[in-house]
Amino acid sequence: MTALSRSEATEEGGNQQMHRKTASLNSPVSCKEKPDRVEEPPDYSLHWPEGLKGEEIKKCGREGITLNKYNQQYHKLFKDVPLEEVVLKVCSCALQRDFLLQGRLYISPNWLCFHASLFGKDIKVVIPVVSVQMIKKHKMARLLPNGLAITTNTSQKYIFVSLLSRDSVYDLLRRVCTHLQPSSKKSLSVREFSGEPESLEVLIPEMKWRKVCPSSRSLSLPDNIPCIPPSSVDSTDSFFPSRKPPMSEKSRAQVASENGGRWAWPMPGWGPACPKKMPNCSPTAKNAVYEEDELEEEPRSTGELRLWDYRLLKVFFVLICFLVMSSSYLAFRISRLEQQLCSLSWDDPVPGHR
Protein backbone atom coordinates (compact mmCIF):
# COMPACT_ATOMS: atom_id res chain seq x y z
CA MET A 1 0.00 0.00 0.00
CA THR A 2 2.76 2.37 0.83
CA ALA A 3 4.48 1.72 -2.53
CA LEU A 4 1.24 2.43 -4.44
CA SER A 5 0.64 5.68 -2.54
CA ARG A 6 4.18 6.84 -3.25
CA SER A 7 3.84 6.13 -7.02
CA GLU A 8 0.53 8.01 -7.16
CA ALA A 9 2.10 11.00 -5.40
CA THR A 10 4.98 11.13 -7.87
CA GLU A 11 2.54 10.95 -10.82
CA GLU A 12 0.48 13.83 -9.43
CA GLY A 13 3.63 15.93 -8.92
CA GLY A 14 4.73 15.29 -12.53
CA ASN A 15 1.30 16.29 -13.86
CA GLN A 16 1.40 19.54 -11.90
CA GLN A 17 4.84 20.42 -13.31
CA MET A 18 3.67 19.73 -16.87
CA HIS A 19 0.59 21.93 -16.31
CA ARG A 20 2.78 24.80 -15.07
CA LYS A 21 5.07 24.55 -18.12
CA THR A 22 2.14 24.64 -20.57
CA ALA A 23 0.62 27.59 -18.72
CA SER A 24 3.85 29.51 -18.88
CA LEU A 25 4.14 28.86 -22.62
CA ASN A 26 0.54 29.89 -23.34
CA SER A 27 0.58 33.07 -21.24
CA PRO A 28 1.73 36.15 -23.30
CA VAL A 29 4.75 37.97 -21.94
CA SER A 30 5.03 41.68 -22.67
CA CYS A 31 8.25 43.37 -23.72
CA LYS A 32 8.32 45.35 -20.51
CA GLU A 33 8.55 42.18 -18.44
CA LYS A 34 11.65 41.00 -20.39
CA PRO A 35 14.91 41.66 -18.56
CA ASP A 36 17.08 44.41 -19.92
CA ARG A 37 20.11 43.40 -22.01
CA VAL A 38 23.45 43.59 -20.32
CA GLU A 39 25.49 46.45 -21.80
CA GLU A 40 28.77 45.37 -23.29
CA PRO A 41 31.87 47.13 -21.93
CA PRO A 42 33.40 49.72 -24.31
CA ASP A 43 36.25 48.62 -26.50
CA TYR A 44 39.40 50.53 -25.64
CA SER A 45 41.67 48.61 -27.97
CA LEU A 46 43.50 50.45 -30.77
CA HIS A 47 42.00 50.12 -34.24
CA TRP A 48 44.56 50.52 -37.04
CA PRO A 49 43.67 51.39 -40.63
CA GLU A 50 43.21 48.53 -43.02
CA GLY A 51 46.04 49.62 -45.33
CA LEU A 52 48.76 49.28 -42.69
CA LYS A 53 50.95 46.22 -42.68
CA GLY A 54 52.18 44.31 -39.67
CA GLU A 55 55.55 46.06 -39.48
CA GLU A 56 53.95 49.51 -39.80
CA ILE A 57 51.46 48.70 -37.03
CA LYS A 58 54.30 47.63 -34.76
CA LYS A 59 56.22 50.81 -35.58
CA CYS A 60 53.21 53.08 -34.88
CA GLY A 61 52.56 51.26 -31.63
CA ARG A 62 56.15 51.67 -30.49
CA GLU A 63 56.15 55.38 -31.36
CA GLY A 64 52.90 55.90 -29.44
CA ILE A 65 54.29 54.13 -26.38
CA THR A 66 57.55 56.09 -26.46
CA LEU A 67 55.76 59.43 -26.92
CA ASN A 68 53.47 58.63 -23.99
CA LYS A 69 56.52 57.81 -21.90
CA TYR A 70 58.31 61.01 -22.91
CA ASN A 71 55.12 63.03 -22.27
CA GLN A 72 55.05 61.82 -18.67
CA GLN A 73 58.73 62.67 -18.25
CA TYR A 74 58.13 66.09 -19.82
CA HIS A 75 55.40 67.09 -17.35
CA LYS A 76 57.37 65.59 -14.48
CA LEU A 77 60.47 67.66 -15.28
CA PHE A 78 58.73 70.90 -16.31
CA LYS A 79 55.87 71.36 -13.86
CA ASP A 80 55.13 74.94 -14.94
CA VAL A 81 54.10 73.75 -18.41
CA PRO A 82 50.32 73.16 -18.65
CA LEU A 83 49.13 69.57 -18.69
CA GLU A 84 47.35 70.15 -22.00
CA GLU A 85 50.72 70.39 -23.78
CA VAL A 86 51.53 67.23 -25.71
CA VAL A 87 55.06 66.35 -26.75
CA LEU A 88 55.43 66.31 -30.53
CA LYS A 89 59.06 65.20 -30.73
CA VAL A 90 61.92 64.38 -28.40
CA CYS A 91 65.47 64.50 -29.73
CA SER A 92 68.82 63.91 -28.11
CA CYS A 93 71.17 66.88 -28.50
CA ALA A 94 73.71 69.05 -26.68
CA LEU A 95 73.43 72.67 -25.58
CA GLN A 96 76.53 74.65 -26.51
CA ARG A 97 77.81 76.86 -23.70
CA ASP A 98 81.27 77.01 -22.16
CA PHE A 99 81.18 73.24 -22.65
CA LEU A 100 78.62 70.92 -24.23
CA LEU A 101 75.66 69.86 -22.07
CA GLN A 102 74.24 66.58 -23.35
CA GLY A 103 70.50 66.22 -22.84
CA ARG A 104 67.11 66.10 -24.55
CA LEU A 105 65.05 68.69 -26.39
CA TYR A 106 61.26 68.43 -25.89
CA ILE A 107 59.18 70.11 -28.61
CA SER A 108 55.51 70.88 -27.91
CA PRO A 109 53.04 73.24 -29.66
CA ASN A 110 53.81 76.20 -27.35
CA TRP A 111 57.09 75.40 -25.60
CA LEU A 112 60.65 74.33 -26.43
CA CYS A 113 62.23 72.76 -23.35
CA PHE A 114 65.72 71.36 -22.85
CA HIS A 115 66.83 69.22 -19.92
CA ALA A 116 70.31 68.02 -19.01
CA SER A 117 71.85 66.49 -15.91
CA LEU A 118 75.38 67.46 -14.86
CA PHE A 119 76.89 65.86 -11.73
CA GLY A 120 73.41 65.17 -10.36
CA LYS A 121 72.21 68.74 -10.95
CA ASP A 122 69.31 69.37 -13.33
CA ILE A 123 69.83 72.07 -15.96
CA LYS A 124 66.61 73.26 -17.59
CA VAL A 125 65.99 75.72 -20.41
CA VAL A 126 62.42 76.79 -21.24
CA ILE A 127 61.76 78.78 -24.44
CA PRO A 128 58.22 79.95 -25.31
CA VAL A 129 57.42 79.51 -28.98
CA VAL A 130 56.05 83.06 -29.16
CA SER A 131 59.42 84.53 -28.11
CA VAL A 132 61.37 82.83 -30.91
CA GLN A 133 62.61 85.41 -33.42
CA MET A 134 64.98 83.38 -35.59
CA ILE A 135 65.89 79.74 -36.23
CA LYS A 136 69.05 79.12 -38.21
CA LYS A 137 70.92 76.00 -39.23
CA HIS A 138 74.31 75.85 -37.53
CA LYS A 139 77.55 74.02 -38.27
CA MET A 140 79.52 72.67 -35.35
CA ALA A 141 83.15 73.82 -35.70
CA ARG A 142 82.18 75.18 -39.16
CA LEU A 143 82.24 71.65 -40.55
CA LEU A 144 79.57 69.35 -39.08
CA PRO A 145 76.03 70.34 -40.18
CA ASN A 146 74.25 69.05 -37.08
CA GLY A 147 73.15 72.14 -35.15
CA LEU A 148 70.33 74.67 -34.82
CA ALA A 149 70.62 78.20 -33.42
CA ILE A 150 67.48 79.70 -31.81
CA THR A 151 67.33 83.44 -31.06
CA THR A 152 64.61 84.92 -28.81
CA ASN A 153 63.16 88.41 -28.54
CA THR A 154 65.44 89.12 -25.55
CA SER A 155 68.53 88.64 -27.80
CA GLN A 156 69.39 85.34 -26.13
CA LYS A 157 70.87 82.73 -28.43
CA TYR A 158 70.65 78.98 -27.80
CA ILE A 159 72.73 76.64 -29.98
CA PHE A 160 71.74 72.97 -30.01
CA VAL A 161 74.29 70.67 -31.65
CA SER A 162 74.78 66.91 -32.13
CA LEU A 163 71.33 66.55 -33.69
CA LEU A 164 71.13 63.27 -35.60
CA SER A 165 68.06 64.35 -37.61
CA ARG A 166 68.52 68.11 -37.91
CA ASP A 167 66.39 68.51 -41.03
CA SER A 168 63.36 66.79 -39.48
CA VAL A 169 63.66 68.93 -36.33
CA TYR A 170 63.98 72.06 -38.49
CA ASP A 171 60.83 71.14 -40.45
CA LEU A 172 58.91 70.51 -37.22
CA LEU A 173 59.99 73.87 -35.79
CA ARG A 174 58.92 75.55 -39.02
CA ARG A 175 55.42 74.07 -38.57
CA VAL A 176 55.29 74.91 -34.86
CA CYS A 177 56.56 78.51 -35.16
CA THR A 178 53.84 79.81 -37.44
CA HIS A 179 54.91 83.44 -36.93
CA LEU A 180 58.20 82.79 -38.73
CA GLN A 181 58.83 82.64 -42.45
CA PRO A 182 61.81 81.27 -44.40
CA SER A 183 64.20 84.15 -45.04
CA SER A 184 66.68 81.85 -46.78
CA LYS A 185 67.27 78.14 -47.30
CA LYS A 186 68.87 77.78 -43.89
CA SER A 187 67.02 80.19 -41.61
CA LEU A 188 63.58 81.28 -40.39
CA SER A 189 62.86 84.81 -39.21
CA VAL A 190 59.92 87.01 -38.21
CA ARG A 191 57.67 88.20 -41.01
CA GLU A 192 58.48 91.66 -42.25
CA PHE A 193 56.08 94.38 -43.46
CA SER A 194 53.37 93.22 -41.06
CA GLY A 195 51.99 96.76 -40.70
CA GLU A 196 51.13 97.30 -44.41
CA PRO A 197 49.68 94.06 -45.74
CA GLU A 198 47.38 95.74 -48.24
CA SER A 199 50.03 97.71 -50.14
CA LEU A 200 52.39 94.75 -50.48
CA GLU A 201 49.97 91.93 -51.28
CA VAL A 202 50.52 92.33 -55.00
CA LEU A 203 54.06 93.67 -54.98
CA ILE A 204 55.94 91.04 -52.98
CA PRO A 205 54.71 87.90 -54.83
CA GLU A 206 55.43 89.56 -58.16
CA MET A 207 58.93 90.60 -57.12
CA LYS A 208 59.73 87.09 -55.86
CA TRP A 209 58.79 85.35 -59.07
CA ARG A 210 59.99 88.01 -61.49
CA LYS A 211 63.65 87.79 -62.49
CA VAL A 212 65.80 90.89 -62.42
CA CYS A 213 67.45 92.01 -65.63
CA PRO A 214 71.15 92.68 -64.84
CA SER A 215 71.40 95.51 -67.38
CA SER A 216 68.57 97.68 -66.07
CA ARG A 217 66.83 97.60 -62.70
CA SER A 218 63.95 99.91 -63.63
CA LEU A 219 62.55 97.43 -66.18
CA SER A 220 61.91 94.80 -63.48
CA LEU A 221 59.35 96.90 -61.59
CA PRO A 222 55.64 96.08 -61.95
CA ASP A 223 53.65 97.95 -64.57
CA ASN A 224 51.30 99.62 -62.09
CA ILE A 225 54.12 101.55 -60.37
CA PRO A 226 54.63 105.01 -61.93
CA CYS A 227 58.16 105.93 -62.88
CA ILE A 228 59.86 108.45 -65.17
CA PRO A 229 58.00 109.01 -68.46
CA PRO A 230 60.02 109.10 -71.70
CA SER A 231 59.29 112.82 -72.14
CA SER A 232 61.26 113.73 -69.02
CA VAL A 233 64.47 111.99 -70.04
CA ASP A 234 66.31 115.27 -70.52
CA SER A 235 65.41 116.37 -66.99
CA THR A 236 66.78 113.16 -65.51
CA ASP A 237 70.17 113.72 -67.12
CA SER A 238 70.84 116.46 -64.59
CA PHE A 239 70.49 113.96 -61.76
CA PHE A 240 73.06 111.60 -63.29
CA PRO A 241 75.89 113.62 -64.83
CA SER A 242 78.38 110.77 -64.49
CA ARG A 243 76.15 108.34 -66.36
CA LYS A 244 75.55 110.58 -69.35
CA PRO A 245 76.66 108.67 -72.48
CA PRO A 246 79.10 110.37 -74.85
CA MET A 247 76.57 110.69 -77.68
CA SER A 248 75.41 113.66 -79.67
CA GLU A 249 71.87 114.84 -80.10
CA LYS A 250 71.69 113.47 -83.64
CA SER A 251 72.77 109.99 -82.60
CA ARG A 252 70.15 109.99 -79.83
CA ALA A 253 67.42 111.02 -82.24
CA GLN A 254 68.56 108.36 -84.72
CA VAL A 255 68.42 105.60 -82.08
CA ALA A 256 65.01 106.78 -80.93
CA SER A 257 63.63 106.79 -84.50
CA GLU A 258 64.91 103.26 -85.13
CA ASN A 259 63.12 101.95 -82.04
CA GLY A 260 59.80 103.61 -82.86
CA GLY A 261 60.04 106.59 -80.55
CA ARG A 262 61.33 104.62 -77.55
CA TRP A 263 64.68 105.27 -76.02
CA ALA A 264 67.18 102.42 -76.20
CA TRP A 265 70.25 102.84 -74.04
CA PRO A 266 73.25 101.16 -75.66
CA MET A 267 75.35 100.66 -72.53
CA PRO A 268 74.15 98.94 -69.33
CA GLY A 269 73.58 101.25 -66.40
CA TRP A 270 72.78 104.36 -68.51
CA GLY A 271 69.04 103.91 -68.44
CA PRO A 272 66.76 106.17 -66.39
CA ALA A 273 66.36 105.01 -62.81
CA CYS A 274 64.38 106.38 -59.91
CA PRO A 275 66.56 108.79 -57.89
CA LYS A 276 66.25 109.33 -54.17
CA LYS A 277 64.24 112.57 -54.46
CA MET A 278 62.04 111.86 -57.46
CA PRO A 279 58.38 112.86 -57.06
CA ASN A 280 57.03 110.34 -59.59
CA CYS A 281 58.42 107.21 -57.85
CA SER A 282 56.37 105.81 -54.98
CA PRO A 283 57.99 104.44 -51.79
CA THR A 284 56.73 100.95 -52.65
CA ALA A 285 58.92 101.03 -55.76
CA LYS A 286 61.97 101.86 -53.66
CA ASN A 287 61.15 99.02 -51.26
CA ALA A 288 60.79 96.69 -54.23
CA VAL A 289 64.24 97.64 -55.53
CA TYR A 290 65.76 97.13 -52.08
CA GLU A 291 64.08 93.74 -51.79
CA GLU A 292 65.46 92.71 -55.18
CA ASP A 293 68.95 93.68 -54.02
CA GLU A 294 68.57 91.52 -50.91
CA LEU A 295 67.31 88.57 -52.96
CA GLU A 296 70.33 88.88 -55.23
CA GLU A 297 72.82 89.20 -52.37
CA GLU A 298 71.64 86.03 -50.57
CA PRO A 299 72.92 83.50 -53.14
CA ARG A 300 76.21 85.39 -53.33
CA SER A 301 76.75 85.10 -49.58
CA THR A 302 75.87 81.40 -49.61
CA GLY A 303 78.31 80.89 -52.48
CA GLU A 304 81.05 82.67 -50.53
CA LEU A 305 80.38 80.47 -47.50
CA ARG A 306 80.61 77.38 -49.63
CA LEU A 307 83.94 78.54 -51.10
CA TRP A 308 85.23 79.18 -47.59
CA ASP A 309 84.16 75.68 -46.51
CA TYR A 310 85.87 74.14 -49.53
CA ARG A 311 89.08 75.98 -48.67
CA LEU A 312 88.97 74.70 -45.11
CA LEU A 313 88.41 71.16 -46.35
CA LYS A 314 91.39 71.47 -48.69
CA VAL A 315 93.62 72.69 -45.86
CA PHE A 316 92.55 69.83 -43.61
CA PHE A 317 93.06 67.32 -46.43
CA VAL A 318 96.61 68.60 -47.03
CA LEU A 319 97.38 68.37 -43.30
CA ILE A 320 96.07 64.80 -43.14
CA CYS A 321 98.19 63.81 -46.16
CA PHE A 322 101.26 65.39 -44.56
CA LEU A 323 100.67 63.51 -41.30
CA VAL A 324 100.25 60.20 -43.14
CA MET A 325 103.46 60.73 -45.11
CA SER A 326 105.45 61.76 -42.04
CA SER A 327 104.20 58.78 -40.03
CA SER A 328 105.08 56.38 -42.86
CA TYR A 329 108.57 57.92 -43.13
CA LEU A 330 109.12 57.54 -39.38
CA ALA A 331 107.99 53.93 -39.53
CA PHE A 332 110.42 53.28 -42.38
CA ARG A 333 113.31 54.85 -40.46
CA ILE A 334 112.49 52.85 -37.34
CA SER A 335 112.50 49.60 -39.33
CA ARG A 336 115.89 50.47 -40.89
CA LEU A 337 117.37 51.17 -37.45
CA GLU A 338 116.08 47.85 -36.18
CA GLN A 339 117.70 46.07 -39.13
CA GLN A 340 121.04 47.81 -38.45
CA LEU A 341 120.92 46.85 -34.78
CA CYS A 342 120.18 43.24 -35.69
CA SER A 343 123.10 43.15 -38.15
CA LEU A 344 125.48 44.61 -35.55
CA SER A 345 124.42 42.06 -32.98
CA TRP A 346 125.08 39.22 -35.44
CA ASP A 347 128.51 40.59 -36.43
CA ASP A 348 129.81 40.98 -32.84
CA PRO A 349 131.77 37.90 -31.53
CA VAL A 350 130.19 35.93 -28.74
CA PRO A 351 131.97 36.75 -25.42
CA GLY A 352 134.12 33.85 -24.02
CA HIS A 353 134.38 32.18 -27.41
CA ARG A 354 137.85 31.92 -29.04
Curated annotation (Swiss-Prot):
The chain crosses the membrane at residues 312-332. Its main location: endoplasmic reticulum. One of its GO terms (biological process) is endoplasmic reticulum-plasma membrane tethering. Residues 72-139 form the GRAM domain. Residues 1-29 have a biased composition (Polar residues). Keywords: Cell membrane, Endoplasmic reticulum, Lipid-binding, Membrane, Transmembrane, Transmembrane helix. GO terms for molecular function: phosphatidylinositol binding; phosphatidylinositol-4,5-bisphosphate binding. Residues 1-46 are annotated as: Disordered. Participates in the organization of endoplasmic reticulum-plasma membrane contact sites (EPCS) with pleiotropic functions including STIM1 recruitment and calcium homeostasis. Constitutive tether that co-localize with ESYT2/3 tethers at endoplasmic reticulum-plasma membrane contact sites in a phosphatidylinositol lipid-dependent manner. Pre-marks the subset of phosphtidylinositol 4,5-biphosphate (PI(4,5)P2)-enriched EPCS destined for the store operated calcium entry pathway (SOCE). GRAM domain is required for specific location to endoplasmic reticulum-plasma membrane contact sites (EPCS). Mediates interaction to phosphatidylinositol lipids and binding to plasma membrane. This is GRAM domain-containing protein 2A. It comes from Homo sapiens (Human).
